[in-house]
Amino acid sequence: MDSKANIKICQMSQKDIDSIKENFSSDFDKFWSYETLAQDFKSNDSTYFACKTVDDIVVGFIGLKIVLDNADIMNIAVKKDYRNHGIGSLLLKQAILHAMSKNCMQIMLEVNSTNSPAIALYEKFCFQKISVRKKYYNQIDDAIIMQKIL
């Protein structure tokens, strides 16, 4: 990736969801699937943002669900060859701004305890670890629950 100037963040469309099925198939794993993503996208209380190249190719996305004054980040993904270029930060910042615009008081998320890059990203944005679900993933890895007060 050349520059952040060559990308844009926008609200996701159904066309983008279809594109994700093709372009992110190797990024889906045993913990979440395209079908789960597509179903969540259609939910009235969910909002998804995409990071796209100038050629309109989705290279990252984030989804959040807002219920009353609480936002939950449901998922965030960046294509492998676009990682470590600030796209995750741009997506997370957009999600935080959206939650604030909806008068949310906090944002919650869950992350695999082995996902050090994601944990570092969330801590950079002042998310704090508030709880652990032992052996949550595959009865092996812990899930860390993180929260950001807005």
Model-based region annotation:
Residues 1-15, 131, 144, 148:
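Conserved N-terminal entry element of GNAT/NAT acetyltransferase domains
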Residues 79, 83, 110-112:
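Residue-level recognition of the GNAT/N-acetyltransferase active site
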